[in-house]
């Protein structure tokens, strides 16, 4: 420290060297003038107990040390800062008026004494040498420092300052880091709380992740359980459906067995006269009729008999006449109500029934005839009843017990098989002169005479004409029935089918005879229209169309105002099915049936009902054309010009596809034209109401079929259904009388719930809209595939054109709206 402080006056030579030299020279002059005074001054306060011999080496060593220190100090910046500090300190000390500190004063005094000591020449030379050496060193240092690289200065400076900063900051930082124990405890507590918070957060995240995993797994498990449950439910539903189908099949089989055995609820309560009571009861007991217990059969008593479908089938085969019961003789309250409703509806007295042929039958005669027929229509194959002949009634009424007259019949069937002898009753008891004699070679040559005479020529006109004139139909039908009734044949379907084929052949032969003997005039057209039936006419308008054709072709008006113009042949199973379909709808008008007694042609079995739709007197108003028809009118003409032989149906398909591919902008003018035409049409016909006519095509399973194809399809389906169920119902055979009249078959009372298993055409229950009204309906037992088709499609081209002639007058009627797909408009 002493060396640095001693050399401080010389450090500022770079800034004010001239000032220093002038100061020194002035001091030397003053000292020279006052030399003698200075020599007498005491030395102790100046030297501070230091001899002169020691002061000079100290000064020289100080100068050398300063030179060495200056040589080490190579930074110009450091030199300037140090010089500035020293100069400021030196000037402060020189200019300050305050007293100096003791150490500073002692240093100054040492310098002064060292300067003033010795001779002036020596001191001047030494000072000049010192100044020169200092100047030279300064110049050398300045030139050397200018040539040095700045990086070296920065390195030295950074090293020096780094050491100083390390000495400074390490202690402070250590003090701050170490701190007090309280601060360290606080920091430790903060760190521990932060660590615990982080640990808890980590645990929360892990727990949430585990919960999410568990939730996803539970959801997957729930979905799997739901899928398993749904699959189990579907399997259970499928099993239940299969069980239901099996149960339904078993129920059908049981019901068919019940039908065969006769265990059915009562459908009809016949009334028997007293003279046939015992015989009918015995016959019914042998044939499976179920009599209620405790019934006594006394003369004058009315007793109920449970009718079963098998007896109805036999009744259909036997050809029963209409059942008319006297109101006073009916003991069952339900029958009383039904007959009263029937009498009130049609305004007829049920004591007598007038047939179309002008014959009137009273209830006594009807009862006698019905009793005889009931006793004879059920024949057990295993137990033939012994013949119980009774004397014929000579009072003019028909005696049902003339078995000897039946034995005289010349039918080939009765000659080969003596089935007629085993019958308990004879329904064809007549004088021998009235029974026509038929040759064995042509048993059916006179079955359908064209003359509309009474089927039975009896001397007494008030007597009942027997519905069965000869023994041919009854004997053959009963033989077939007894063969089909055999329990051994129910499992043998081949035998049953053979019997059915024989019956079909018989019916075809009857139809051929009928076609040969019918006149080719108006009656032929009428019968052909009637033979078309209602099976394919599934909507109301087409049936109305068929109804209206009858009076138009015959030109005959209805005798009774209550009867509608429709004519339907009930002797065909197709027509019976059509009537059943009509009866099944509650919206249809109630129908009732008149039976063919006055005439001999099949076409007289008719259904009368009110006409629906547009009356024949009303003019036909065409529909206004829609947008498609407006567009298609010209397009159709263009296509016909290009392809004259193209069918209308193909043209309509082409036009329909084109119309669908058109954009709305292209269709817009045609829609405007449609609006204009609709407005004009509304102004012209303000009361117009669109009544669509039936279409000639039927859509079945997405396919468009014609009427003939539809009929054939329905026949095949019915045949399949008939073969699917066990053959437990007796097919019915048409019964012909001696004069060739084909009589209708079964007599039924209308029930509201027809049995579903009776799918064949011989099912005779019908669902009537009013269950209180008995509907007597007749059916043939067998439906032929080929024969029925031939009978249904007997219409020639002319008749079909007459039926559909107005289709071509208004071809746009096939297009009900623009949204529907256009259908084929054909001329055939």
Curated annotation (Swiss-Prot):
Its main location: nucleus. Changing residue 766 to L: In TOLCAS; uncertain significance. Residues 184-262 form a coiled coil. It comes from the Eukaryota. Keywords: Activator, Autism spectrum disorder, Coiled coil, Cytoplasm, Developmental protein, Differentiation, Disease variant, DNA-binding, Intellectual disability, Isopeptide bond, Nucleus, Phosphoprotein, Repressor, Transcription, Transcription regulation, Ubl conjugation. PANTHER family: FI18025P1 (PTHR45789), TRANSCRIPTION FACTOR SOX-6 (PTHR45789:SF1). Homodimer. Interacts with DAZAP2. May interact with CENPK. This is Transcription factor SOX-6. It comes from Homo sapiens (Human). The gene is SOX6.
